[in-house]
């Protein structure tokens, strides 16, 4: 299924259900079993409200601020290296930032291990063989880690900052008034941590776009943020992230001459919808200015799901994604300068998540005050 009309149909709860729709290997790695993505109806809306409550404007800005601080610290290390793979280098500052923001204590000795676990859950989830097995193992270990933290929070062994994700999830109660099991609570806390670290994919694509469209970097370097939001949204529209989401037909029906039998798995093409010529003029062109006029609507622009976040299965963390991308674009444009050496910048379409083949290598990183060095 592809296109805004198909997306609107896909998010009709009377016709499609989410429970058990995603393949087991994806649920065992990327999503976790029992999490909000696989719920339906009132149970889904109740659980979703938990996540929406964490995404107030003040909290989103606070996470962005913390990420900016972590980026600045990371960049001091980048400057001591001849070159870095940007995608890989972004994981740790994102993990540090979101754990601090979420109230998840992270000892310095744990940072690398926990970051690897969070990355494995989205970077290797769709692989086969040993990488997929490592993703499953990372999921089990991360759930055990966070289950213990949630238990400690519930018995007041550790303090949870007001408004933190750890505190909110530890104290959340289901529709029956019962606290979430430790494992399900851990799955939901990972649904805060993991996708935040996965924003590294979008930031890598933003750096790719800044390199291929240097006029935009020049505008941001000059301090013109007028179209920063439009630039970030166009990166999210133009570049692939995870390509599709799944549902199962709740009751059989026919739509536009096509029969959907009960129980049939349906896939919504997220990337294809974001490149659909019925919604977007020149969909295969990178044109941020398009967002000055039209945002594609709730079912036409769906890089992280369609509909409304508080009702449908649209990611409630979209404001976080946008904020972190803005922080990163400003940082790459105004805080540091760097060279982009010869490399394979073609998109690895068969990879999930898709990325530039090289991972976006940058070289000779310097503080911006040393003067522009970006090779275009």
Where are these regions (language model features)?
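Cytochrome P450
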Residues: 1-376
């Amino acid at each position: 299924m592809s296109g805004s009309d198909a997306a609107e149909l896909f998010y009709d709860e009377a016709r499609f259900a989410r429970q058990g729709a995603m393949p087991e290997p994806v649920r065992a790695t990327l999503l976790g079993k029992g999490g909000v993505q696989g719920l339906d109806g009132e149970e889904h809306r109740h659980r979703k409200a938990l996540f929406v409550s964490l995404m107030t404007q003040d909290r989103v800005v606070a996470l962005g601020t913390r990420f900016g601080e972590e980026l600045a610290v990371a960049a001091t290390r980048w400057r001591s290296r001849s070159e870095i793979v940007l995608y890989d280098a972004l994981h740790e500052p994102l993990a540090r930032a979101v754990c601090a923001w979420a109230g998840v204590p992270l000892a310095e000795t744990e940072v690398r291990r926990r970051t690897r676990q969070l990355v494995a859950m989205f970077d290797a989830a769709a692989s086969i063989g040993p990488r997929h097995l490592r993703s499953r193992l990372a999921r089990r270990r991360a759930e055990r880690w966070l289950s213990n933290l949630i238990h400690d929070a519930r018995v007041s062994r550790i303090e949870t900052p007001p408004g933190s994700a750890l505190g909110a999830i530890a104290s959340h109660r289901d529709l029956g008034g019962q606290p979430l099991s430790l494992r399900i609570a851990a799955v939901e806390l990972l649904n805060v941590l993991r996708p935040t670290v996965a924003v590294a994919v979008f930031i890598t694509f933003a750096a790719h776009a800044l390199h291929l469209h240097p006029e935009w970097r020049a505008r941001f370097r000059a301090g013109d943020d007028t179209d920063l939001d439009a630039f970030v949204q166009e990166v999210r529209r133009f570049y692939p992230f995870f390509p599709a989401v799944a549902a199962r037909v709740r009751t059989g029906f026919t739509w536009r001459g096509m029969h959907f039998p009960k129980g049939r798995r349906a896939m919504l093409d997220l990337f294809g919808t974001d490149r659909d010529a019925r919604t977007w003029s020149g969909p295969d062109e990178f044109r941020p200015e398009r967002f000055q006029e039209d945002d594609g609507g709730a079912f036409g622009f769906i890089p992280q799901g369609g509909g409304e976040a508080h009702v449908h299965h649209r990611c409630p963390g979209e404001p976080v994604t946008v904020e972190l991308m803005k922080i990163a674009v400003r940082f790459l444009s105004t805080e540091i300068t760097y060279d982009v050496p010869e490399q394979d910048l073609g998109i690895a379409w068969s990879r999930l998540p898709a990325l530039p083949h090289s991972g976006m290598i940058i070289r000779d990183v310097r503080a911006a005050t040393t003067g522009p060095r970006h090779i275009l």
